């Protein structure tokens, strides 16, 4: 969330699932805790608690069934509307001077197309990720022309480049996701939908 806010994002939707109620509480105002901290003179902690609840406009939607990242992204359709939007995988923490999602938003502004963060992974690990077919354009910019989610054989590996837990997508992805058949593990894979527009 802090990365998104640092990138200038003010409206944030967090897709959760069963057992994640504490996450919602974390970003909520906590008058009882604030009162306790104020009475005990812990002003530094009080300020931190107040800042957390005021970081951004944060909403939550529950993904009732674990049907994959594509299914989770599809849950955001009514929140997003027809605007481009950022996707930040919940299990990926990326640090840097310029937030990773800010860099992608800037590149989206330059190219006007969907943008994904890319990382190079070890050959022995590529089967755990999506493999991207890329063409180097300039500096650290690549054009992605194809992708394969979790390649199972060496022939399916397009390269050792994979998605780096961040992307900026156009709203057109929702219609594609609605028509994407479940893939690996019976899940709706975001990469399968993104492949349609690569």
Q: Which residues does each predicted region cover?
A:
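Short loop/turn motifs at secondary-structure junctions
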Residues: 8-10, 81, 110, 143
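N-terminal glycine-rich phosphate-binding loop and ensuing alpha1 helix
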Residues: 1-38, 42, 79, 98-103
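Alpha-helix/helix-capping structural signal
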Residues: 18, 92, 99, 171-172
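Conserved beta-loop-beta/alpha segment of the NTase-like Rossmann-fold superfamily
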Residues: 33-35, 43-134, 178
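Catalytic-core segments of class I nucleotidyltransferases/pyrophosphorylases
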Residues: 86, 105-109, 136-198
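Small/polar loops that bind or transfer phosphate-bearing groups
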Residues: 14-15, 61, 165
